[in-house]
Amino acid sequence: MKYALAVNSGTSSLHSAFFGINLGPGDEILCPTYTFLATVTPIFQCYAKPILCDCEEDTGNICPKDIEKKITEKTRAIVITHMWGHPCDMDKILEICKRHKLLLIEDCSHAHGATYKGKKVGTFGDVGCFSFQANKIVTGGCAGVMITNDQEIYERACLLGHFRNRSFDTVKSEKYSKYSNTGFGLNYRIHPLAAAMAINHFRDLDNRIKIRNENLNYLSLKINELNTCIKAPITRVNCFRGAYYGYKPLYYGYEKWGVPPEIYAKALEMEGFDVGIPGSKPLHLLNLFQGGEKDLYSFRGVYRPLLNNYINYKEGDLPKSEYYYKHTLSFPTFTFVDKNVIDKFVEAIKKIDENKEELIEYCKINGCFKK
């Protein structure tokens, strides 16, 4: 990519991207429902309408078939997230974009260093967005970057959150340079210390990615050997997860044993490991996407263009994402440990499997057993 714009968060990089492509009132943009909220919420700031799409059952990524179903004459763009580091099906998505003349924004916040058929994510679409938030493998505490090959997108994105010196250096076109002194009203500048931290983390990024993938591939092998209620996350052929932001196995103990995932996670936590439920609930199950933004619009005059066109999803509208979310656990990513620690973690899984009757009895006593 020719251009890179450093900003103060991954959210700001996405807002800059949406503003950069000139997304506006009356436009629709197709989005994953299974993603972190910041992939989509900046769209409201552009007065456009996000249209949520279901996910693939095996990766959690946006489903190309559902993308096709949601395209209308108002559709301007697609934003995708490479969830938990697994690249989306770029061949199918790019073909859809080409056929319908749609712009593509990649949210790569989970996928530093990930590749699809040998090509880095973030370089397929019109814009790539990355987060350097505290939990990312490259971090500035809170920072982000937007990359693109399009000069106009770059200049518009810069003017959204930068002014004076940064914009004087970046914005060269006659169309936009007259706004360089003021920008368009926001301050998205990256903090110098955040930039210094992120640059330092890039120095050994490849090695840290290598270690994490080796460890998690080993964990997947061991989990699948157990043949228990846990299924290791898949990585498709020609895909490389890069930073592997989250290791999210699928859990089938609710169907097999009647034990809810949060109880199983607590049992593993009692064995000394950081295990939980992923926080990224499908967006269509959140209040903002179930008509809640009506309240937001009513006291924020800038949103009035959407007052009569609010979003009103409900449970069951995007069933694959609901299924995926309900069956996903969050395991440690084991970046800086030796194989012995991973072996102990696998032994903990095996121990719970061998003593599952105690867990089932606990659920029956506490009223959370599924018959």
Task: Locate each region found by the language model.
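Conserved N-terminal alpha-helix of the aminotransferase class I/II PLP-enzyme fold
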Residues: 1-10
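PLP-dependent aminotransferase-like
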Residues: 19-108, 115
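Short, proline-centered helix/strand-breaking motifs
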Residues: 32, 319, 331-333
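Basic phosphate/pyrophosphate-binding loop/patch that engages nucleotide-derived ligands
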Residues: 95-103, 145-165, 259, 263-273
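Active-site region of PLP-dependent enzymes
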Residues: 111-117, 124-246
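Conserved PLP cofactor-binding pocket of PLP-dependent enzymes
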Residues: 165-175, 218-229, 264-328, 358-370
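Conserved PLP-binding active-site segment of the aspartate aminotransferase-like
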Residues: 236-238, 244-256, 275-294, 326-340
